[in-house]
Swiss-Prot record:
Residue ranges covered by zinc fingers (C2H2-type): 183-205, 211-233, 243-265, 271-293, 299-321, 327-349, 355-377, 383-405, 411-433, 439-461, 467-489, 495-517, 523-545, 551-573
InterPro entries attached to this UniProt entry: KRAB, KRAB_dom_sf, Zinc_finger, Znf_C2H2_sf, Znf_C2H2_type
Organism from which the protein derives: Mus musculus (Mouse)
The gene coding this protein: Zfp54
Zinc among keywords: yes
Domain KRAB: start-end pairs: 13-95
Protein name, per record: Zinc finger protein 54
């Protein structure tokens, strides 16, 4: 026991060193469950610090816990029991954190078997020394007053607490030595050594996230995760992301985030499902997938067949097909289909655009967004399609492009049942049903739903063609049309039919061709009920009913419904038809 007194004088780790203090305002923000959890964790921290030969008289701690209990009546009598006191704060006798102290004997050990020493300790002769706050002084004064009036009763109760403390500590040490995990999860049967660890696991299972970030509203199951998350906001504001990707220049706050991001460039998928052999780049993706094989209850999307194991995820996914955007920003009235996107957007109103592009002057909230934007000026495209070798500035653009090959159309119009590969395409299409054609061409009086469509159309009248082919000198109004045209010179046909191996230069040509195999004819004439494979053929067919013949021969004034018919007719005047006949004969 002599060694114990020496260790005390040298200032061992005290409960104050590992405790977490709440201000009055913070304490009032916690609900009853969080307060109860706080007390439970503090009790557990203390029990891990305690040694049998080094503990303070328990009445001081009991009074402190009682004060905490009075500040939150909803906790009931859980802290008033002496059994809880035996596991709570011990000395707190370090010089720097002396909030309350009822013993100042540095030369003698605190031996509970010595009643005289215990008695002198609780006479109140030694005054409490408070260096932190008035609350601690008040607490010590109350303790000293209570000790003077009830010293005899406390001496008797102390013997009872000693016996309980020794037995409890022995059981605790025994559990540590034999590796016992007394706290069992009723759902999965997994055991934990502490109640706090069990609580974290239960919150993970139920999805309860009591720790919320006051900047972005993101929630966490553990306080430590919240603290780590707050550091990301500090780094974003300071613009300090030490880990940089060599391929695209994007920076990250953590090395693990950089390693995870690097898989996008390498295409590495190291996590493989043992059941079906499907591989994933991330462990979270594999875990999510494995629920398909193990889960009893699941929700399947009737449109795309995707399976979900949580109803909230299924409902969130379903808005992709319906185009519903329930989350609306009150400041700019912009709507979002998912709460995650909405929460990310709200940051734009609270932050300042401190990152400015030197080339065009455009400003951004986040440094990574500026770096992504800067690729427009440098021409850097780090993301490459493995099918057609096309390059992209952003990974999201690559994923969107890859849907061309998979034929996946996630977004469905509920009015006309038309499907789209992009959410933006669906939104643009839906305006056909909801909005009038307000944009009118001054030259030909044609109306359009979108201003961009009107501007594109006006180039027909102005003859504006900014995009010129270097091979043949042909010009085009759109860059995408030029890229498709250039495949004529290169012979590239990236879109291949899986049925007959026929290849095409455009995705639309492939889709039209595939209707030959499926027999699909989605375009129906309202006049005669005839079904046709393409919209262009339908428009040409409808001219039969209207009598419209817009294509006129300049030689003989004869008119035709289709331009191909006019070209065929013009060969009569040029003599091309006779030449072909003569060559055949």
């Amino acid at each position: 026991m002599a060694d114990s007194s020496v260790n005390l004088s040298q200032g061992l780790l005290t409960f104050r060193d590992v405790t977490v203090d709440f201000s009055q305002e913070e304490w009032e923000c916690l609900d009853s469950a969080q307060r109860a959890l706080y007390i439970e964790v503090m009790l557990e921290n203390y029990s891990n610090l305690v040694y049998v030969e080094n503990y303070c008289i328990c009445d001081t701690v009991c009074q402190h816990v009682k004060t905490e209990k009075e500040s939150c009546n909803e906790l009931g009598e859980m802290l008033h029991e002496p059994s809880n006191c035996a596991l709570y704060n011990r000395s707190d006798t370090t010089e720097a954190s002396n909030n309350y102290r009822c013993c100042k004997d540095q030369d003698a050990s605190l031996d509970s078997s010595n009643p005289d020493r215990l008695k002198s300790t609780h006479t109140g002769k030694e005054r409490c020394e408070s260096k932190d706050c008035a609350k601690s002084s008040s607490l010590c004064s109350s303790i000293a007053q209570d000790q003077r009036t009830n010293s005899t009763n406390k001496e008797q109760r102390q013997e009872k607490y000693d016996d309980h403390f020794i037995s409890t500590h022995s059981l605790m040490q025994q559990a540590i030595y034999i590796g016992e995990n007394p706290h069992q999860c009723m759902k999965y049967g997994k055991c934990f050594s502490s109640a706090s660890s069990l609580g974290v696991q239960q919150r993970t299972d139920t999805g309860n996230k009591p720790y919320k970030c006051n900047i972005c509203d993101k929630s966490f199951t553990e306080c430590s995760s919240l603290k780590e998350h707050r550091k990301t906001h500090q780094r974003l504001r300071a613009g300090t992301n030490p880990y940089k990707c060599n391929d695209c220049g994007k920076s990250f706050s953590y090395l693990s985030a950089l390693q995870s991001h690097h898989k996008r460039h390498t295409g590495e998928k190291r996590y493989k499902c043992k059941e079906c052999g499907k591989s994933y780049a991330y462990r979270t993706g594999l875990k999510r997938h494995q629920k398909i094989h193990t889960a009893e209850e699941c929700y399947s999307c009737q449109y795309c067949g995707k399976v979900f194991h949580q109803l909230s995820h299924f409902k969130s996914h379903f808005t992709l097909h319906t185009g519903e955007k329930p989350y609306k920003c009150n400041e700019c009235h912009r709507s979002f289909p998912h709460y995650v996107f909405f929460r990310r957007h709200k940051k734009n109103h609270s932050l300042q655009k401190s990152h400015k592009c030197k080339e065009c002057g455009k400003s951004f909230f986040i440094l990574s967004h500026l770096k992504t934007h800067y690729r427009i000026h440098t021409g850097e495209k780090p993301y490459k399609c493995t099918k057609c070798d096309k390059l992209f500035t952003q990974y999201s653009h690559l994923r969107r492009h890859q849907r061309i090959y998979t034929g996946k159309k996630l977004y469905r119009c509920e009015v006309c049942d038309k499907w789209f590969t992009l959410s933006s395409s669906l939104s643009r299409h839906q305006k056909i049903h909801t909005e009038a054609k307000t944009y009118k061409c001054k030259d030909c009086d044609i109306f359009f739903n979108h201003y961009s469509s009107l501007r594109r159309h006006q180039k027909v009248h102005t003859g504006e063609r900014h995009y010129t082919c270097k091979q043949c000198g042909k010009s085009f109004t759109r860059g995408s049309t030029l890229r498709v045209h250039q495949r004529i010179h290169t012979g590239e046909k990236p879109y291949k039919c899986s049925e007959c191996d026929k290849s095409f230069t455009q995705a639309s040509q492939l889709r039209t061709h595939q209707r030959v195999h499926t027999g699909e004819k989605p375009y129906v004439c309202k006049e005669c009920g005839k079904s046709l494979t393409t919209c262009a053929i339908l428009r040409a067919h409808q001219k039969i009913h209207t009598g419209e013949k817009p294509y006129k021969c300049m030689e003989c004034d004869r008119s035709y419904i289709q331009y191909s018919h006019l070209k065929r007719h013009q060969k009569v005047h040029t003599g091309e038809k006779h030449k072909i006949v003569n060559n055949v004969t």
